[in-house]
């Protein structure tokens, strides 16, 4: 509930909708998001893996906005944005929602730096080859934007304001965004 509360607050979301979470009892790793649901396979939660469990839940839930509603006009060149920005928001809400301590957030940023160093192409040319470098490099771009937005507005706006602007300029996701929409939402 804290994850959902933190993400809906970030998005300024007040609508009440049905969203299903499917947790099959399969010892595997990963999740897949759909418009009104996601499935998540992971080993049973323990104290040791609780931050990883919570992060994947937060990541897949945020795809409700940044994938199911907000979609790029070109799928392949926007994967870094959809996955990386979603990963950053997941990391952020663990801290802001008091699901995990700030040290977990800082650890995630450190791991993103390590993973992003393995990137062998530009983000927009990575295509559909998902993996840690894509998620992490995109998350670092999101982190940079969040810091820049907060600094430019003396803390009055953040990455959530950017996403709310992007929803607005795409008519709540009815229209797929172009890079000009991203720029417009960032500068609004």
Located regions from the model:
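Amphipathic alpha-helical substructures
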Residues: 103, 124, 131-139, 143-188
């Amino acid at each position: 509930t804290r994850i959902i509360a933190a993400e809906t607050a970030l998005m300024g979301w007040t609508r009440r909708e049905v969203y299903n979470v499917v947790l099959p009892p399969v010892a595997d790793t990963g999740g897949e998001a759909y418009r009104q649901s996601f499935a998540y396979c992971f080993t049973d939660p323990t104290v040791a893996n609780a931050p990883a469990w919570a992060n994947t839940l937060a990541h897949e839930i945020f795809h409700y906005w940044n994938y199911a509603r907000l979609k790029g006009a070109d799928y392949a060149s926007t994967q870094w944005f959809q996955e990386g920005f979603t990963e950053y928001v997941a990391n952020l809400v663990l801290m802001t929602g008091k699901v995990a301590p700030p040290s977990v957030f800082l650890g995630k940023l450190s791991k993103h730096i390590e993973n992003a160093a393995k990137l062998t192409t530009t983000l927009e040319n990575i295509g559909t080859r998902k993996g840690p470098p894509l998620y992490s490099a995109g998350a670092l771009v999101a982190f940079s934007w969040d810091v820049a937005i907060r600094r430019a507005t003396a803390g009055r706006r953040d990455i959530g304001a950017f996403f709310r602007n992007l929803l607005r300029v795409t008519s709540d996701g009815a229209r797929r965004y172009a890079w000009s929409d991203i720029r417009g939402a960032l500068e609004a």
